[in-house]
Amino acid sequence: IFTEYELREHQEQYASRIVKTGNLTLSIKGSYGIKPGDKPFKYMVANYMAVDVYKQYEYEQMELKSAGPNYAQNGRSGWGFGKILSRFGTNHEVNYLTFDFYDSMNDILNLRSNTFKFTKSQLAIWKSQDKLRELKNSHIMTLIASER
């Protein structure tokens, strides 16, 4: 889809912004609202999760049974979930990633700017989820270019 010239120009333009490079190998555990061959979403939030090695099965089941199927309730257009395979050990706290996909930056910012008052049952659900994982970081990303 992109010419060699376009790819080279794009890479040169953004190369100066790179602070650190690396790679992650993920096992995709689940996704909702995403189909192979679909055009990629323009906006994504990557959530970096630390999960105790002894609670990984329970954590995966929680994500697959509650977070994934309910992705649209929080304004998300899609959701994904993966386990990091290429890094392991006590020096690597983050061992899972979740991906929230959005149609607009405004959707992300509105969700983040709202302060929710939880009901007792909602609070109990969130606290039970927090016993299984700890959100270490969250990054908003914008799709710059894609090729299918």
Task: Give residue spans per PLM region.
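Short S/T/G/P-rich N-terminal loop/turn motif that feeds into the first structured element of a domain
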Residues: I1-R148
